[in-house]
Amino acid sequence: MLFHTLTTLLAVATCAAGAPLEKRAVVPHDSLSPHAESIRTGAEGTAIKTFEPYLHIAHGCQPYPAVDDQGNVSGGLQDSGSSTGGCRDETKGQTYVRGGAYRGRYAIMYAWYMPKDQPNSGNVAGGHRHDWEHIVVWLDDANKANPTLLGAAASSHSGYTTTKTPQTIDGTHPQVEYFTNFPTDHELQFKTSPGKEYPMWDWATMPDVTKNALATTNWGKANVPFIDANWEPKLDKAWVE
């Protein structure tokens, strides 16, 4: 009896240890709530907070959560009807962030998810379900008491708009605008304009099920810039000379 019990427990433990991460659900885009702010501690966390951007939505959707801590992901919105239809809620915003040393500098990527990318109201060419946009802030050293801002890059379709002197508040918080030049879809630019900060969720503090959901979900024509597969390629493109 004892042998049988031990064998059963061992089998259960082995199965649990080897079990893959459970696939979670695709849920309505407005059913997800922003995760409470969660960033790493220490000097790197301080730098992430110091250079937190302000985002202004000049056109299109407000930012929404893309995923939760159970691995459920947003189903997004069809790119039809009003360009802001179903995605006007200003209380849903979430900023995703990842930081790390790269090529002798420190990079912080701040990213936002929008349920659809629709350059104009109606059924127009160029729109699509899901949109991911981001900026990269380049510092000399996040472990310094006062890191130096070396430049920044804003996502622009498949590339970046780069600058050594992005518009900022207090010299550290980049001012970022989400906009479109019809008929092209949305992109980001650095611009002096009103903006908001949103709760930040750091890649370093996310559970594995959330990281897995971000990495394995089919986001259509959009892609998550800060997952492992995209992190360094994006930083290469976003480099500021």
Regions found by a protein language model. Name each.
Residues 1-23:
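Fungal secretory targeting signals
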Residues 20-133, 148-241:
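A domain-level signal for the mature, folded cores of soluble proteins
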Residues 138-142:
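Short beta-strand micro-motifs enriched in acidic
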